[in-house]
Amino acid sequence: MSGHDSKYFSTTKKGEIPELKEELNSQYKDKRKDAVKKVIAAMTVGKDVSSLFTDVVNCMQTENLELKKLVYLYLINYAKSQPDLAILAVNTFVKDSQDPNPLIRALAVRTMGCIRVDKITEYLCDPLQKCLKDDDPYVRKTAAICVAKLFDINAELVEDRGFLEALKDLISDNNPMVVANAVAALAEIQENSSSPIFEINSTTLTKLLTALNECTEWGQVFILDALSKYKAADPREAENIVERVTPRLQHANCAVVLSAVKMILQQMELITSTDVIRNLCKKMAPPLVTLLSAEPEIQYVALRNINLIVQKRPTILAHEIKVFFCKYNDPIYVKMEKLEIMIKLASDRNIDQVLLEFKEYATEVDVDFVRKAVRAIGRCAIKLERAAERCISVLLELIKIKVNYVVQEAIIVIKDIFRRYPNTYESIIATLCESLDTLDEPEAKASMIWIIGEYAERIDNADELLESFLENFPEEPAQVQLQLLTATVKLFLKKPTEGPQQMIQVVLNNATVETDNPDLRDRAYIYWRLLSTDPEAAKDVVLAEKPVISDDSNQLDPSLLDELLTNISTLSSVYHKPPEAFVTRLKTTVQKTEDEDFAEGSEAGYSSSNPVDSAASPPGNIPQPSGRQPAPAVPAPVPDLLGDLMGLDNAAIVPVDDPITQSGPPLPVVVPASSGQGLQISAQLSRKDGQVFYSMLFENNSQSVLDGFMIQFNKNTFGLAAAGSLQIPPLHPATSARTMLPMVLFQNMSAGPPSSLLQVAVKNNQQPVWYFTDKIILHALFGEDGRMERGTFLETWRSLPDSNEVLKEFPGITITSVESTIELLTAFNMFFIAKRKNGNQDVIYLSAKDPRDVPFLIELTAMVGQPGLKCAVKTPTPEIAPLFFEALELLFKA
């Protein structure tokens, strides 16, 4: 619709639908075209015009391309709600796919691919096969994308009808845009498939590199992304690939530049020549710098990616730090990212320039930016030992400005500097103490208290300074209370005089009697008993030499960094999280959460929680109150350990909890307290005595009593559901309860490919429903009867076709010994069959059996003590193999 068609969006009078129906059936072409435009306009603004489906479909029989496009647009929107009527359009689609006009042929196959109705996919196959071999490249490139859409609707159909092979053939097409679309489609299919579909070999590589020079910019992005996954055979091949890709660094499109950088970084891992690497680093710097002259939004994406790049290859931009200096009109989100990169690029050579910039930023008006700038100075001091003194000088100058939030942030970072360089810069403590009265932020107070406690022997009036903080001890945040407690103990141990002795009595009394905070209370009791039992031992513990903190500017784990670098120019590189942390793969994990699955406000489907007598609880689902709740039984009296030391009263000591309540391994947090209104839920599937359980820990950090707990599990691959009700007693504030909920299998199974996704809903009487996602760990489902005889194992292995064998490598896993590996896997019902040597590698064979008695034949290959584990699984259900690999990796990394 053109710009002149805005009149169709104007509000129409009552009785619009009958009038449109009449116009759609008019004998005049122009009137029908205007009517379809009105229908599309109404549909666009949200009006329901589905009742006109048959009338609009009748308008498909036209030679007018514009009208045909509009009708197709209507069909895409309403075919899902009217699947039976959509079949009426099939004959026209098939006819249009054979039209002499290539635009109409492409339009027909594109529209059929967009209509996500199973009944239509059967009719799509024949036209699609013809279009994949069409003489016109425009039709072929459209058909290539349609294969990916069809795979998303019906993967089995795509494989059975040979569309994947046809798609691979298009990589050899003489038209670069067809090649690019074929690559894009294959890459999309590979993302949603567990088996290898798109593998680049040397022949394919040459074709892709040739097409790279001739296709459009977005085609180049698809090809570069595919090439970044190719592993060169040797350094020479890697150099040749990089040489062909390097010209893309000069491209005007930012996406092409970042994809080229990603591809070059991946190949650089294989290049051994230092000269070649040095030259590549020089070539990558200018295009990355150019990205920073784009719009702020693009700058932000570029900066997030550059942040990753400089962590891996800091030499690329080591001489370009000035381009990251903040401009006065930069948005705050750009300034923050520039600060991060400046810290990473700071060196002894450029630190003076960097400190001048940071000092300038610390005088700006944006409080968050100022805080970040002050903290950046401290991080540079920790990173660069030679520059630490200059950094401290700048911080002291900022303290003299007497701006409250600047002073407080400076004290926080100086505490970290003292940790990094103990007994070096303590001469500035007097200056810091001048600002005591202005401190009102918990972190700044805690930092100042730590400094006073740590250097109490060098501060003459340390007891007076701490006493000034103690006046408001009960009202202080937990962070400050904990630091005050420790600092007072340090002061007493360093200066065991009357003043500190009285202070510690007050603090310990407040921390054990007057507080509801379990962390504070527990720490106070630890100190209390340490001091009363053996003050010398207390000195060894409390005044022990602390580990020196290290530079935190490269905060990402190396394995995570490598994964993020393979995802440069994607959302993953902006979030700095791996894709699986925030994306569920559409084909494998997205499941419906309709009203019948998780009914908001309805208790149907939930397993309820009732406060019942423990004797009546089902076996294995017994609530276990944790140590956060005082145990009812009073233990043997605690000896008066403090009486002879300070004459303190021991009567206030809370009974030590029964250790049985602390049993069980720590569970992963699935609902943190911060997002659960104070309720924290930890959970994981487990197995005990042949029964599958859902182990759960509920912790109430809110101020209310929580009761009436209920749980519901969504449809899932294995049909896991609760076997009984959830037995959780009313949770009072600062208490917790652990339970093991028995589970049953194959009750509520989901359709579609296997997935480890477990969607859970938990509710109680006081809060809204909490939805969370957990993992089905396959080894929790393996049966105790999975052991095979060696002969049976060999016979089963040979009887299964090679296509049922799935391989995966785990480069980050190291086997320390064969025996410990066998012991670990046997504990999770993966039973040892045999082992052998293959050169300097050990090969272990194991067997397991899933709940449906489907065998898993496992072959593990690794070199003891060296990173890298190869796993082959042969099973009648190879589609489950990815879930097995996921569980195996979890076991080895636990």
UniProtKB/Swiss-Prot annotation:
GO biological process, alphabetically ordered: intracellular protein transport; vesicle-mediated transport
Residue ranges the record marks as coiled coil: none
SUPFAM superfamilies registered for this protein in UniProt: ARM repeat, Clathrin adaptor appendage domain, Subdomain of clathrin and coatomer appendage domain
Subcellular location as annotated: Golgi apparatus; Golgi apparatus, trans-Golgi network; Cytoplasmic vesicle, Clathrin-coated vesicle membrane
Secreted found in the keyword field: no
UniProt keyword list: Cytoplasmic vesicle, Golgi apparatus, Membrane, Protein transport, Transport
Keyword NADP: no
Annotated GO CC locations: clathrin adaptor complex; clathrin-coated vesicle membrane; Golgi apparatus
Stretches for region Disordered: 597-640
Classification via Gene3D superfamilies: 2.60.40.1150, Leucine-rich Repeat Variant, TATA-Binding Protein
Ranges annotated as spanning the membrane: none
Lipid bilayer topology: Peripheral membrane protein
GO molecular function: clathrin binding
Domain of life from the UniProt record: Eukaryota
Stated family: Belongs to the adaptor complexes large subunit family.
Function (record text): Subunit of clathrin-associated adaptor protein complex that plays a role in protein sorting in the late-Golgi/trans-Golgi network (TGN) and/or endosomes. The AP complexes mediate both the recruitment of clathrin to membranes and the recognition of sorting signals within the cytosolic tails of transmembrane cargo molecules.
Binding partners and assembly: Adaptor protein complexes are heterotetramers composed of two large adaptins (beta-type subunit and alpha-type or delta-type or epsilon-type or gamma-type subunit), a medium adaptin (mu-type subunit) and a small adaptin (sigma-type subunit).
Protein name: Beta-adaptin-like protein B
Organism, as annotated: Arabidopsis thaliana (Mouse-ear cress)
